[in-house]
Structure formats: structure tokens, C-alpha cells
A protein has these predicted regions:
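Helix-loop-beta element that forms the nucleotide-linked donor phosphate-binding surface
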Residues: 349-355
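Bacterial N-terminal signal peptides that target proteins for export
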Residues: 2-14
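Short N-terminal segments immediately surrounding and downstream of signal-peptide cleavage
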Residues: 33-43
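A short, structured beta-strand/loop element
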Residues: 48-58
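Sec-dependent signal peptide cleavage junction
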Residues: 20-33
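Structural signature of tandem-repeat unit edges
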Residues: 30, 35, 58-80, 91-104, ...
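Signature of short aromatic-glycine-proline-rich micro-motifs recurring in repeat-based ectodomains
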Residues: 83-86
Length: 363
């Protein structure tokens, strides 16, 4: 976004020098043109690339259409992509969404976010980025093939009705590539095209085709039980959910991805799988109502990122008799950690935990 603003200034200055002035009828310059609630960038830093479109933040239109071609000054400019305005909805513009939905600024808004009900994409348009806090958005329509660049991501869009996962959408590698992250959209129905080789939808949650990986939980339930056939819980799978109070994880689950249970505003209890070997980075970051954690004996490694004040743990029971390299420096000092032997106590000190540790041997 900053690149584009800088580019716009440079191009505009050059255009003014050449005598090309604004066209007030459509609010355009040589870098962009705004029409019908949409801003089209016609000149990109890659001269061979197609232009892209963004919403006009001041638009009060309830319906907008994203064109795949724009006529300007007698020339036709192709448009290939649409970018959601996620950068304007961050608590800290110098940060990112890498730690999950806690970075989303839910107090931020603009006219477009208050007004938009339906957005339609012309054939050939690829959607990029995260759609955040569109209060009236109900319909996302693709006239051609459904196409997303990096991730299918919608957050805090309470009236959103349907999201389609196209057959062309690839297998997730990490969050920024072929990820699915749809949270706080209580009215949404997620549909995976049958021909998609990587995904299926069960009870509105997204799984791998064979069901062994749970990618995205959209559930509005208060109590959530992970299915017995699940072997892996993906990165950010529950992150940002604001209805679930308790999670029960069967022993079939072998791995849990980074930040999977982070920013869950009502989560107060979780039962972990006895098959887990480690807890990934930031797995509970920002879930402040989670005060107690019972860690099964097979979990020997913690990758940290408890987040200082972003966690409110009071009691943690670690059942392993030997820990591997871990990080506890930012676990709250108000948390009392119960361990099985003095060896684990020494290891916790080595891993920078400064709070109270109690050795309590198993009876």
C-alpha cells in the first residue's frame, strides 16, 4: 500500500509536468481512476502486469462491480486483481497478522465498510488479502471462475452468506499460501467444489480431503469436540473464534499448528491430546480466559510466545519427566507451574521462566 501511494505521487508529479491534469468527472489521474465505488490502479510497478482494483473507502454504494478492463484517455487497461484493504484495519500498521486476529482493529471503519452489501468480480479477477469488518456484506460473486491469490480470508462479516472454495485452490503450505481463515461470520455457509482435490467441508468446518487435517473452524458452538478422525489441527484453525468456551481434543490428534487456539475470547478450558509431542509457537496467544492448562506427559517441548500480558495463565501442570529445548520467558509470572521432578524444574529455569515452580510427584 505504501509503495503504491509513493508511486502515485511520483507518477502524478510527472504527469503534471507534462500537462496532464485531473479529470474531475471521474476523479482520475495517470496512476489511478475512481469510478462506481472502485479505485483502479492502471499503472503498476511491473510494467507488464495487469492493474488492480480496491474499494473507494468513501463510497456509500451497497453494490459494486469490479471490472476486468478500464477505459481511460482513449486507452484500454486490463485489470487482473482486487485487493481488500486489510492494511487499514490493523492495530499497528508496522506489524502483521502473523500472530493471528488479535492484530485486527475492530474499532476501525469507513463508509465502504458500513455500506457494502454485494461485491461482484468480472471474469479473470483474482482476489487478494483479508476482508475485515464489512458489517452489511452478504454476497461475494464471481462471474467467472472463483479465484483467490493467497488465502480465502473473511473476518467479522456478520451477514456474509456463502463462500466457495474453488477446485483450483491449492493445498495449504503455510498461512500466506492457500490458507483458509474465516472467523466471526456467523451466517456464512462454506462450500467446497467437489472437484477440489484438497478440501472438504463438514458441518461448515474445513478439512483436508481425507479428513485428517482440520484447517478452519467456523463453528458458533460453545463446546467444541474435535472429530476422532482428525490427526492434525492446522495453523490458526480456531484463531479469532469468539463463541467457543471449551475444546475437547481426542488422542488421535498428533500435531497442532502455530497460533491454532489464539485470540479465542471465550475459551476457558481445553483438553489436549495425549499423542501430542510439542506445543507450537503462540498456540494460545491472546486467549485470556484460559487460566489453567494440563499438559500431557508426551509433550516435551514448548515453542513459546505466550505474549506476556496476552496470557492470563494461573496454573499449568507439566506431566513430562524431561523437557527438550523450549521457551518460557514470556509466560506470566503470576502462573504457578507444577512439575513432576526437580529435573524439569531446573529445565524451566534454563528456559527462562521466572515464576513459581512446584515439584509435585505423581502419587
Amino acid at each position: 500500500m505504501k509503495k503504491m501511494k509513493l508511486l502515485q505521487g511520483v507518477i502524478l508529479g510527472g504527469c503534471l509536468f507534462l500537462g496532464l491534469f485531473f479529470l474531475p468527472s471521474i476523479g482520475a489521474n495517470a496512476a489511478s481512476v475512481t469510478m462506481d465505488g472502485v479505485r483502479y490502479w492502471l499503472i503498476d510497478w511491473d510494467s507488464e502486469a495487469k492493474g488492480h482494483a480496491e474499494l473507494d473507502p468513501d463510497s456509500d454504494l451497497s453494490e459494486v462491480y469490479i471490472r476486468n478492463e478500464v477505459e481511460f484517455l482513449g486507452k484500454s487497461y486490463p485489470v487482473g486483481s482486487f485487493w481488500w484493504d486489510e492494511d487499514d484495519f490493523m492495530v499497528d500498521s508496522d506489524d502483521s497478522f502473523a500472530e493471528g486476529w488479535g492484530q485486527a482493529d475492530l474499532k476501525e471503519t469507513n463508509t465502504a465498510h458500513e455500506s457494502l452489501r454485494k461485491i461482484t468480480f468480472a471474469p479473470g479477477i483474482t482476489v487478494q488479502g483479508r476482508a475485515i469488518s464489512f458489517k452489511k456484506l452478504e454476497e461475494v460473486v464471481f462471474e467467472g471462475e472463483v479465484s483467490y491469490m493467497d488465502e480465502v480470508s473473511y473476518f467479522n462479516c456478520p451477514k456474509l452468506k456463502t463462500i466457495v472454495l474453488p477446485s483450483s485452490y491449492g493445498e495449504p503450505v503455510y498461512r500466506s499460501e492457500f490458507a483458509i481463515d474465516i472467523k466471526r461470520c456467523p451466517s456464512v455457509q462454506i462450500v467446497a467444489e467437489e472437484s477440489n482435490p484438497h478440501f472438504q467441508v463438514i458441518d461448515n468446518d474445513v478439512y483436508s480431503k481425507d479428513g485428517t487435517i482440520l484447517y478452519n473452524v467456523t463453528s458458533n458452538a460453545k463446546k467444541y469436540e474435535v472429530e476422532e478422525f482428525v490427526r492434525h489441527i492446522g495453523e490458526y484453525a480456531f484463531n479469532g473464534n469468539n463463541t467457543i468456551r471449551s475444546v475437547t481434543m481426542p488422542d488421535s490428534v498428533q500435531t497442532v499448528g502455530r497460533y491454532a487456539f489464539g485470540e479465542m475470547k471465550k475459551l476457558s478450558s481445553i483438553r489436549l491430546s495425549k499423542s501430542l509431542r510439542k506445543l507450537e509457537e503462540g498456540v494460545f496467544l491472546g486467549s485470556k480466559k484460559l487460566k489453567k492448562l494440563d499438559v500431557p506427559k508426551n509433550i516435551k517441548r514448548f515453542d513459546g510466545d505466550f505474549g506476556w500480558k496476552k496470557n492470563k495463565f494461573k496454573k499449568m501442570i507439566i506431566r513430562t519427566k524431561n523437557m527438550k529445548k523450549s521457551s518460557f520467558y514470556d509466560l506470566s509470572k503470576k502462573c504457578t507451574v507444577y512439575v513432576r521432578n526437580k529435573k524439569v524444574k531446573r529445565q524451566l529455569r534454563k528456559f527462562d521462566f521466572d515464576g513459581k515452580i512446584v515439584v509435585k510427584k505423581k502419587k
